[in-house]
Amino acid sequence: MDNSRILHTELCDMLGIEYPVLLAGMGGLAGEGHAAQPKLVAAVSNAGGMGVLGATGLPLDELRAEIREIKSLTDKPFGVDVLLPEDLSVSPPPNMSLVKLKRNFIPKQHIDFVEKLAADYGVPLTEIRQELVFSVEHSKKQIQVLLEEGVPLYCAGLGIPDWLVPMAHEGGMKVLGLAGNVRGALRHKKARDDFIVAQGYEAGGHTGRIGTFALVPQVVDAVAPTPVLAAGGIGDGRGLVAALVLGAVGIWVGTAFLFAEEANITDIHRKMITEANEEDTRISRVWTGKTLRQIKNPIQEAFDSSGLRPLPMLVQLLLMMDLINSLAKAERHDLLCAPTGQIVGMLKETKPAKQILDDMVNGAIKLLGETLPTKVKIES
């Protein structure tokens, strides 16, 4: 990065970072690692952006260990993303075994479907009997770890963290919430979040139904003066400039950083995204019960054509958990969820995270300082 050319917004001052680029807190499903792990988080922070750890579902000891690993790799600010599935219509008790949870909450036809899938692919289906670590109760315990470890930024990928904002602010931790529509953004504003990410339909992972270009300016207007970041379909300097023009103070970037050397994804996932184009993603509720964009695969296609109704969040994940872990154990990563945004078609090369960030920021600087002034003339 040319240190004489700095791209700076109010977000940089509020978070103590050089460039208005945040790594999306990309997590993983049971049996798969989280893409935004400590090495990637630290690399983005060290490059001048802000890395965010994807921590949903991590056991408390692993969460604490990963936060401390990040601290050992960088002295720059970073964040942690934990989903808060507070909007469940069915919330399994935290101390109930997974086997009993299934018996109590999951319809037989759904279980039969998963068992048939496992048989069709020749994967032994092993029941998991560990503690359910993706729950409301567990999320609250994770937040306590963040406060104890002095994490600068908490990110709510799902859910409205109204109950924790006062506690976070008292502990010196800022709060960021993601929204896929204006209604959700207003709920985050009411909860007094410090920042709101307006995430468009194009994004990978859990996403909504409104496109980024339509969503961002509406959220900016609705929640002013709360700072807004843009997400969804942003992968280079052009996307960064567009976000700023729409009124955002920065960007929340996931898919572009899947191409980082430090990203914790399997070789098969990396091959899939490298070969994919903009038409190769699908939105499905098969994995978690929430709409989630991923590279299309046979498991997703089978569920979406089965006629089965997706179950509420957590319950759907509980349904799929044994299959996910069994597929991972059998190294059938080609059948597992690969969250990816529509921007994937323009990203082909694996690079260090620093180069990805540098290219993005330098591209934006060139557009703002050189390209646009020669292409756009304002005459009186």
Language-model region placement:
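Acidic, glycine-rich active-site loops and adjacent beta-strand->loop/helix elements
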Residues: V182, Y201-E202, G233-I234, A256-F257
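Active-site entrance/lid segments in N-terminal catalytic domains of soluble metabolic enzymes
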Residues: M1-V223
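Conserved active-site-proximal phosphate/metal-binding subdomains
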Residues: L40, M96, K100-I111, A214-L229, ...
